Amino acid sequence: MLGRHECTISESVSALDPTAQEPEYTLVPSTSRDLVRDMTLNMEDAQAHLKEHGWVKIPAVLSKAEAEDALSRLWEAKAASEARGECTFQPILDPNPANVRVFYLPELDAYWRDMLVNPTALDLAKSLLGDQLLVSNFSANIARPGAESMALHSDQSIVLPAPWLDVWAVNVIWCLTRMTKENGATLYIPGSNKWTTWEDVPDNAPDLLVPFEADAGDIVVIDGRLWHTSGSNVTEDEDRAILFAYYSAPHMRPLTNWSAKLPKELQETLSPQLKELLALSHIGYVVKGDLTYMAQKYPSEKGTTAVSA
């Protein structure tokens, strides 16, 4: 696994183009002599773009060789999951079995657990959710030729009632193969992270979808309020394999109950960081406000005597 990503900014859409809804914003490998300074500055820019537009793409977080290794491990995870009786076709999500789903990846291989704490991905998720975020789910979707699109949705609209005013979920999409419009790339609606109610979704929403196109090894980080769907794989012989590392705010119940799903023997081997991320610590970090606010607003005075009603 790679560590923190060294990068600079590349915007291929001119700010002077009046038809551009938002920049095609990605980060490319740095050529700066001061890599540490350059990395810090541009990760801040990436976080700012994620906050404003609801997504950001970071290339080459995995090398091509690492992406190929991860893809091989994913097919092994599919076989292991099916051997345990887990269904890899979910009719509630996908129109046909050409869309393969593999759930509960942290249970299947330490490789996936390491991916959850990748510094680049985790820092971007924390930039929206804060330091005490949780892993709500970690799964895979392989769109094989013939796979069709699922329903349009935002991640938060599925689990939370409107209005969606705050970011309470972040999905990190790990591309193990290239992701193109033809092979079923995730489709999204630019600017939809600003929608706060069902009424904000326009009647022509499907016509507004554009693809996230990426190379094997890239990640795409999306705000839980960004409306998106899977694309259809219209190729004859090309799989599109991606992972979804789904992080949530600490006061939200995770989609997966890891304390019940992960064997106790496995839980005991996890690092303190992973135990907290998987909500296996005995402490729940659910405080969002400031516990000292009212004490500061109404400071007690020494010598004051309580008055009974």
Curated annotation (Swiss-Prot):
Which signals induce this protein? Expression is controlled by the fumagillin biosynthesis cluster regulator fumR. Expression is also under the control of the developmental and secondary metabolism regulator veA. Expression is significantly up-regulated during infection.
Q: Which reaction does it catalyse?
A: 5-dehydro-6-demethoxyfumagillol + 2-oxoglutarate + O2 = 5-dehydro-6-demethoxy-6-hydroxyfumagillol + succinate + CO2
Which pathway? Answer: Secondary metabolite biosynthesis; terpenoid biosynthesis
Q: List, separated by semicolons, the cofactors it needs.
A: Fe cation
Biotechnological utility = Fumagillin and its derivatives have been intensely studied for their potential use in the treatment of amebiasis, microsporidiosis and rheumatoid arthritis. They have also interesting antiangiogenic properties by the irreversible inhibition of human type 2 methionine aminopeptidase (METAP2).
Q: What class of enzyme is it?
A: oxidoreductase
Q: What happens when the gene is disrupted?
A: Completely abolishes the production of fumagillin but leads to the accumulation of the intermediate 6-demethoxyfumagillin.
Family indicated by similarity: Belongs to the PhyH family.
| Record-given protein name | Dioxygenase af480
- UniProt organism field: Aspergillus fumigatus (strain ATCC MYA-4609 / CBS 101355 / FGSC A1100 / Af293)
Gene that this polypeptide is encoded by:
af480
